[in-house]
A protein has these predicted regions:
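Short loop/turn segments that connect beta-strands within the blades of beta-propeller domains
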Residues: 2, 9-10, 33, 49-51, ...
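Structural motif
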Residues: 2-6, 45-55, 90-96, 132-139, ...
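Solenoidal tandem-repeat scaffolds enriched in leucines and small polar residues
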Residues: 5-7, 15-99
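A short beta-strand motif characteristic of beta-propeller blades
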Residues: 13-19, 61-68, 100-107, 144-151, ...
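Repeated scaffold domains used in trafficking and secretory/extracellular systems
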Residues: 22-32, 69-82, 107-120, 152-165, ...
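Residue position within the beta-strands of beta-propeller blades
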Residues: 38-40, 86, 124-127, 169, ...
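Eukaryotic tandem repeat interaction scaffolds
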Residues: 86-157
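Hydrophilic extracytoplasmic domains
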Residues: 139-146, 152, 157-218
Length: 218
């Protein structure tokens, strides 16, 4: 085999194995319902590199659905509100658990600088107009691929994380928590000591520095 994927349960017992003899598996994820697994293999279609997204029911070696993403580079697999999210360098494509297309969002700015899929029924994307610099756009996208809100920014963004009802954005000198509609919910100034942030489901955020971490409670 060129590659293989094995799924284990919480006790460490193997529940599913997928082997690919023709293509290389570049990513795989157990879907949020814990009943299916998605795997992406690298191949080509009509002479163009293409990623094939296959969804398997755990316990079956036959794919329930097969979809092809052409002309873009897959960056990661995740889940938004139960859908399978395929994050590429050009768009966010969402599939339902049975493999049907739920929606797709093509980036308004050409460069993806960050992403987080942990929000309640939405994804947060940080896009850039240029390869470097701070002409940025923060976007929230629903599970059907519809843009919910966008916010332009000229500030340097060090880190972004979405969880539950809020998105935490760490700027060079402040931390701002936004709602999915990108309305400011809370702000903490003077955060030059922090390098990254993790938003938590309970509405708090963890600021991480070079050797310490701090819990921010709005």
């Amino acid at each position: 085999y060129k590659s293989a994927v094995t799924v284990y349960d919480a006790s460490g017992e193997k529940t599913f194995a997928f082997n690919s003899s023709e293509h290389y598996v570049i990513d795989a994820v157990v879907m949020r319902d814990c009943k299916r697994m998605a795997a992406v293999t690298l191949g080509e279609s009509d002479g163009i590199f293409a990623d094939t997204v296959s969804i398997y029911s755990l316990g079956s070696d036959k794919a329930d659905s097969v979809n092809t993403l052409t002309g873009s580079l897959l960056l990661s697999l995740d889940s938004v509100a139960g859908t399978l999210s395929c994050l590429t360098d050009e768009s966010l494509t969402l599939f339902s658990s049975d493999g049907t297309l739920s929606g797709s969002y093509r980036y308004e700015y050409p460069y993806l600088r960050g992403s987080s899929m942990g929000g309640d029924n939405y994804a947060a994307l940080l896009l850039s107009r240029y390869r470097s610099g701070s002409t940025l756009k923060l976007v929230t996208v629903s599970s059907d691929g519809t843009e919910m809100a966008s916010l332009d920014s000229s500030q340097e963004v060090l880190s972004m994380s979405a969880a539950g009802k809020y998105i935490a954005v760490l700027y060079s000198d402040s931390l701002v928590l936004y709602t999915p509609q990108l309305q400011e919910y809370a702000r903490l100034d003077g955060t030059e000591y922090a390098r990254s942030v993790i938003m938590r489901e309970d509405g708090t955020a963890v600021l991480i520095g070079s050797s310490s971490a701090w819990l921010y409670i709005p």
